[in-house]
């Protein structure tokens, strides 16, 4: 079940016309957290209607899904890598310190951006401390989107959480 108050706060940094995530259910399996989400993009925030989900919107949806998954994981103590975090830590680090280090997406069939589903999972989350450098959390993730007409997109992203508590 979606934590509506948490979702509202997670999406607060976004302009009203760029809040695409409508609901999210977070689960944990074998110590790894994942989210299953519903999205709606009534109108693209930057381009005339293309009729399909495009790479910019895929990235925005990924960000919103990932922020909610991390916030919910912190709040509920799910998964690994964020055990020492509080929600206050998350809000402080949400925008400046959660970086997408690598992002790739594959478009298999056009996805209708008006109403579609998505999910993401943490494949691995590790704390790293490079010699002479500041510690950070490294996370490998996978995601996918689909619609009722067999539209399909998937991909992977690597995250770096810097200035970690």
Swiss-Prot record:
A Pfam family the protein falls into: FcoT
Enzyme Commission number(s) of this protein: 4.3.2.11
Reaction(s) catalysed by this chain's protein: a (3R)-3-[(carboxymethyl)amino]fatty acid + holo-[ACP] + H(+) = a (2E)-enoyl-[ACP] + glycine + H2O; (3R)-3-[(carboxymethyl)amino]butanoate + holo-[ACP] + H(+) = (2E)-butenoyl-[ACP] + glycine + H2O
GO annotation, biological process: fatty acid metabolic process
Keywords associated with the record: Fatty acid metabolism, Lipid metabolism, Lyase
GO MF entries: lyase activity
Cross-referenced InterPro entries: FcoT_ThioEstase, FcoT_ThioEstase_Rv0098-like_sf
EC category name: lyase
Residues in the signal sequence: none
Function (record text): Involved in the biosynthesis of a unique class of isonitrile lipopeptides (INLPs). Catalyzes a Michael addition of glycine to the beta-position of an alpha,beta-unsaturated fatty acyl-[ACP], producing a (3R)-3-[(carboxymethyl)amino]fatty acid. Acts on the (2E)-butenoyl moiety loaded on the acyl-carrier protein ScoB, forming the product (3R)-3-[(carboxymethyl)amino]butanoate released from ScoB.
Family stated for the protein in its record: Belongs to the FcoT family.
Protein name per the record: (2E)-enoyl-[ACP] glycyltransferase
Originating organism: Streptomyces coeruleorubidus
């Amino acid at each position: 079940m979606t934590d509506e108050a948490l979702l509202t706060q997670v999406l607060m940094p976004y302009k009203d016309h760029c809040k695409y995530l409508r609901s999210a259910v977070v689960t944990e399996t074998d110590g790894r957290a994942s989210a299953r989400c519903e999205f709606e993009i009534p109108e693209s925030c930057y381009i005339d209607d293309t009729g399909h989900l495009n790479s910019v919107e895929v990235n925005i949806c990924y960000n919103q899904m990932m922020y909610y998954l991390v916030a919910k994981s912190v709040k509920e103590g799910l998964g690994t890598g964020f055990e020492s975090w509080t929600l206050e830590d998350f809000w402080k680090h949400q925008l400046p310190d959660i970086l997408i280090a690598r992002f790739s997406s594959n478009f298999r069939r056009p996805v209708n951006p008006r109403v579609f589903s998505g999910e993401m999972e943490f494949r691995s989350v590790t704390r790293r401390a490079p010699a002479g450098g500041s510690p950070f959390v490294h996370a490998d993730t996978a995601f996918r989107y689909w619609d009722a007409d067999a539209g399909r997109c998937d991909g992977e992203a690597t995250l770096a959480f810097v200035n970690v508590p």
